[in-house]
């Protein structure tokens, strides 16, 4: 069970599949732009 648990953490940490964690797509920078 320790093997599949490490795999699930691999794609979760990946900022490529997680655009919400990506600071590039963050709407915070768009809000500063008038």
Swiss-Prot record:
Tissue specificity comment = Sperm.
Signal peptide positions on this chain: none
Instruction: Tell me the domain of life.
Output: Eukaryota
User: Per the record, where are the segments of Basic residues compositional bias?
Assistant: 9-34
Question: Where are the stretches annotated Disordered?
Answer: 1-34
Q: Which GO terms describe its molecular function?
A: DNA binding
Q: Does the keyword NAD apply?
A: no
Q: What is its main location?
A: nucleus
| Location of this chain's protein in the cell | Nucleus; Chromosome
Q: Which UniProt keywords apply?
A: Chromosome, DNA-binding, Nucleus
Q: Which GO terms of the cellular component aspect does the record hold?
A: chromosome; nucleus
Q: What does this protein do?
A: Histones H1 are necessary for the condensation of nucleosome chains into higher-order structures.
Family, as annotated: Belongs to the histone H1/H5 family.
Any idea what this protein is called? Histone H1, sperm
- Taxonomic source organism: Strongylocentrotus purpuratus (Purple sea urchin)
